[in-house]
Amino acid sequence: MKTLLLTLVVVTIVCLDLGYSLICFNQETYRPETTTTCPDGEDTCYSTFWNDHRGVKIERGCGCPRVNPGISIICCKTDKCNN
């Protein structure tokens, strides 16, 4: 009985996805759509927006970085939420 219980515990641990990795878009302005799998423990995606002499620039990725004045940022917490 103990062997069966131990076997069930081991199988459960092996079969469970013990870690979840967030997927975020990571392309820049006017680039083809690409995604990246965020590092373990990273649970946020971001999009930043700013203007330069060529127009609106957009950057996307994992995390929620601090930005300088004049740069807008949106952070979110679900897969591919930063498009």
UniProtKB/Swiss-Prot annotation:
PROSITE patterns: SNAKE_TOXIN. GO terms for molecular function: toxin activity. It is found in: Secreted. InterPro entries: Snake_3FTx, Snake_toxin-like_sf, Snake_toxin_con_site, Toxin_cobra-type. Keywords: Disulfide bond, Secreted, Signal, Toxin. It comes from the Eukaryota. Disulfide bonds join 24-45, 38-62, 64-75, 76-81. Its main location: secreted. GO terms for cellular component: extracellular region. Expressed by the venom gland. Residues 1-21 form the signal peptide. CDD domains: TFP_snake_toxin (cd00206). Pfam families: Toxin_cobra-type. Belongs to the three-finger toxin family. Short-chain subfamily. This is Weak neurotoxin WNTX33. It comes from Ophiophagus hannah (King cobra).
